[in-house]
Amino acid sequence: MGFWKFSPFLPLSILVLYQVGIIQAAPFRSALESLPDPAVLPEEESRLLLAALVKDYVQMKVRALEQEQETGGASITAQKRSCNTASCLTHRLAGLLSSAGSMANSNLLPTEMGFKVSGRRRRDLQA
């Protein structure tokens, strides 16, 4: 009984597919094989295309070099990365303290002070 419900649908679908062009008497590929492949260029056109690509590339490089010469090459600057970890900060503070300590030793301490002066005995002072 279900077959009778689909019988009018079958010829209608065949007619629609025929009109769309899916069903043909001749194979569809034979028509495509006779056409030349659009991706294949003749040798002369491929040479012209290659020459145009090379010319554009050279012009682009010349413009980049001219811009670099105009700016003087100063557009690229090297910067040291800042480190914010605890070990980097400790190392930086230790460097600052050591440089501050060396400045304090050379500038602020009197010349008569030192490890040899503070431990002198009377005998050394009289001699």
Swiss-Prot record:
Subcellular location: Secreted
Residues where Serine amide is found: S118
Membrane-spanning residues: none
Positions of disulphide bridges: C83-C88
InterPro entries from the UniProt entry: Calcitonin-like (IPR021117), Calcitonin/adrenomedullin (IPR021116), Calcitonin_gene-rel_peptide (IPR015476), Calcitonin_peptide-like (IPR001693)
Entry keyword set: Amidation, Cleavage on pair of basic residues, Disulfide bond, Hormone, Secreted, Signal
Role according to the record: CGRP1/CALCA is a peptide hormone that induces vasodilation mediated by the CALCRL-RAMP1 receptor complex. Dilates a variety of vessels including the coronary, cerebral and systemic vasculature. Its abundance in the CNS also points toward a neurotransmitter or neuromodulator role. It also elevates platelet cAMP. CGRP1 can also bind and activate CALCR-RAMP1 (AMYR1) receptor complex.
Protein name as it appears in the record: Calcitonin gene-related peptide 1
Organism: Equus caballus
